[in-house]
Amino acid sequence: MPSQEDAVAWSTGCCGLVIVWFVLGRLAGSVAGMFNDR
């Protein structure tokens, strides 16, 4: 079993990656929408 610190760091890293990808997707959608409106 991993230590408490390892488990916290691992779960935080995974959640952080999901949040980063979600934000990037939202930004890409906003930029695409701006270009489509022209």
UniProtKB/Swiss-Prot annotation:
Membrane topology, from the record: Single-pass membrane protein
Highest taxon, organism lineage: Viruses
A single GO cellular-component term on record: host cell membrane
Pfam families: Inovirus_G7P_1 (PF17091)
UniProtKB keywords: Host membrane, Membrane, Transmembrane, Transmembrane helix, Virion
Ranges that cross the membrane: 7-29
Location(s), subcellular: Virion; Host membrane
InterPro entries membership: Tail_VII
Function comment: May initiate with G9P the virion concomitant assembly-budding process, by interacting with the packaging signal of the viral genome. The assembly-budding takes place at the host inner membrane. In turn, G7P and G9P are present at the end of the filamentous virion that emerges first from the bacterial host.
Family recorded in the similarity comment: Belongs to the inovirus G7P protein family.
Record's protein name: Tail virion protein G7P
Gene that this polypeptide is encoded by: VII
